[in-house]
Amino acid sequence: METDIKARAKNIPYSAQKVRLVLDLVRGKYVQEALTVLKFTPNAAAGPISKVVASAMANAEENIGVSRDDLYVYKIFADEAPTRKWRRFGARGRFKPWLRRSSHITVVLRERE
């Protein structure tokens, strides 16, 4: 049975829609290749994603003893986190809602044989 190595980051201050654009670049790649792609991706969400991938890689080495050269990104996804809401003043005495969306990032690695 294959073991899944997981890492998760919660309440990342980027919307899940924007994070998913970057996640699609690294899904299915080897971990070292994924970190290189994230390093040169000009998107603000690439920083937290690379930290989560590196954390999952460290979990695999420390807890299970798997070589980092054999790991690949099996699953990676972003879910919506709580949205911070506040009101701005609009025309005619109305309020306009401002939403600051955030996301949870989950990375699952597996060992490729």
Question: Which residues are covered by each model-predicted region?
Answer:
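Structured, basic alpha/beta domains of bacterial-type, RNA-associated proteins
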Residues: 1-14, 21-25, 29-113
